[in-house]
Amino acid sequence: MNTTIKQLAQCAAMTALLGAGAAAHAAAAEPRIGVQLWSVKDEIKQDYAGTLRKIAGLGFQGVEFACEFGPYKDDPAGLKAFLDKHRLQCAGAHLHFDQLAPGRFEATTAFYRTLGCTSLVISMDKRGASIEGSAQMGKELTALAARLAPLGMTIGYHNHAQEFVGAVGSTPWDTIARGTPQAAVLQQDVGWTTFAGKDPVAYVQAYPGRTRTTHFKAKLAEGSSGTPIIGRDKTDWVALTRAVRQVGGTDWIIIEQEEYPDGMGQLDTVAASLKGLRAVLANPAAR
């Protein structure tokens, strides 16, 4: 067991009282596969419906929104009908705290509920760079979790590198995790976790049942070799997939692509990462 896992094992022990519930969550059905639409941000602006049709054609089960709704920005029911027609589900939505502030909460939640979206995730907040800021965010996430629960919705937080600065077990991410209830989703972006020099597998294991949605992204640390496509980089995708299946309670594995090597187009790069992910999912060692 490496140092990272040893240190995080101590964090996991602190959640022992939640073990039964986490185990039940971890025994959920096989994770569905979605794509974060930020991955195709240029193509979707040029042809919204056509890009979604191509995503469906690749075999994705869902899409995670990033505040881009094309011709449907005022018509969530129309967008829901379009998704249904193409057998796509809403895997979640990225947004900011201010969209859930008093005065905007009702309109925001009504839009996403009509869209069939139950998972709302804060995409980033500059306060995540510090322990103090993360503690404050934890309080806000806790309040939002309580307010969203009666609507059948959840709140989550998505990391960048800033949340993983510091000693293992004492990062801003750990502060957010410990300061929020089990119902709050820890949407680990494994690309940013590895970029920050931390082990994404250990963090799934440290907080059982909290990785209900996760971003599978290949992102190379500075000075490392490889290609930023799932299966062509250095990430141990087999171990990570096994962890989200066995421990994370993961409902959605969401591919996110932010780098497009060798002149590849955005959708073509997403397709390449999907191919790599399918190979990982089929590996018996990833069970």
Region spans (language model):
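Acidic-and-aromatic substrate-binding clefts and catalytic sites of carbohydrate-active enzymes
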Residues: V40-Q46, F65-D75, H96-R104, K126-A135, ...
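N-terminal pre-domain/capping segments
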Residues: H25-T118, K275, A282-R287
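Active-site acidic/histidine proton-transfer and metal-coordination neighborhood
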Residues: R53, F82, Q89, F97-V185, ...
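Acidic/histidine-rich catalytic cores of soluble enzymes
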Residues: P150-K234
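Aromatic-rich peripheral "rim/lid" segments of glycoside hydrolase catalytic domains that contact
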Residues: Y260-R287
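Bacterial N-terminal signal peptides that target proteins for export
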Residues: N2-A12
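Hydrophobic faces of well-ordered beta-strands that scaffold small-molecule active sites
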Residues: P31-Q36, V63-F65, C90-L95, L120-I122, ...
